[in-house]
Amino acid sequence: MRLLDKDEKLGRYTLRIENLDDLWYLKNIIAPGDKISAVTFRRIEESSDMQRSREKERIPIRVTIEVEKIEFQDFENRLRILGKVTNGPEDTIGKYQSITVSEETELDVIKVWDDDSINMLKEATEQEHAAVYLAIALDDDEANVFIIHPYGIQQMGTIYSGRSGKYSESSYSETSYFSAIENAIKQFKYPIIVIGPGFAKNGLSAFLKERNYKVVAVSSSNRTDQGAIYEFISSEDGKKLISKEQISRDNEIVSAFLSSLRRGSGIYGSEEIRKYLEMGALSDLIITDKKFRSETGRELLSLARSVGTDIHIVSTSNDMGEIIEKFGGYAGILRYKVQQ
């Protein structure tokens, strides 16, 4: 991601998206209520029947929208941002408009920038990003494709083999199955991890290597869902491969919190967190990416910094973040047990 311009007084940063990882960072930086300004396209409404029968012409317009929803689409290197138009052509004001962001898109992000958003932006605009991996968890019936980002796991979609079940086809072959997987992943230029039960994983690994894909790990698992990815991340081979990634750190700190909870030195909930922060008794504050944007989240982060508490922001796009979200989005590990 490239920073083209900024106006700190207005909270406006002009960015250019350069690769898929930038889209992941952007998804984590922006939130509902922020404003995005970019060029998008609208269709010209034609009046005559003959004109309506033709494909409508699309013209570029520049709009600013107030963000309501942000989403990736399966197997597409695009981020779709939806919201109401606050600035643009007069007939678009107040209407819903989507802005599609992909490689080479330039856009303005206008928001109240807290320290964590700024830190994430700084990391995104550094020349070298943390490693990203493509993971395929498969058996003989289906293959689930994931991207392991520094901040979590993104499921891209599912490819069915057609061997059995509702997607069964009489023309099934292993080669056609592997070719369908290759066709789905060829747009991604990341090192590949292949995971799953049985022999399908070994067959796919050999198939991809013959076609010059970089397969960096093959691992056994009884699962083909996102849980298989976490099994790999927690394994010794997985730790060696992605030990520096955010997802690995999320696993480590959440596991430490759950252990501390069993020992009586773990706490959760915003009020409990606030109480022990004010006492200076909290060693680690764990907060989800959903909560760190909230007013309460910003207050607790500021308090944690003032007393020297270590801060960990975990992504709700992975299981570890979802665990903390079930504890209210806020969790902590005490420096010492406090007498009540």
UniProtKB/Swiss-Prot annotation:
Cofactor: a divalent metal cation
InterPro entries: eFR1_2_sf, eRF1_1_Pelota, eRF1_3, Pelota/DOM34_N, Pelota_arc, Ribosomal_eL30-like_sf, Transl-rel_pelota
Protein location: Cytoplasm
One annotated GO biological process: nuclear-transcribed mRNA catabolic process, non-stop decay
Major localisation: cytoplasm
Domain comment, as recorded: The N-terminal domain has the RNA-binding Sm fold. It harbors the endoribonuclease activity.
Similarity annotation: Belongs to the eukaryotic release factor 1 family. Pelota subfamily.
NCBIfam families: pelota
Subunit description: Monomer.
Name of the protein in question: Protein pelota homolog
Protein source organism: Thermoplasma volcanium (strain ATCC 51530 / DSM 4299 / JCM 9571 / NBRC 15438 / GSS1)
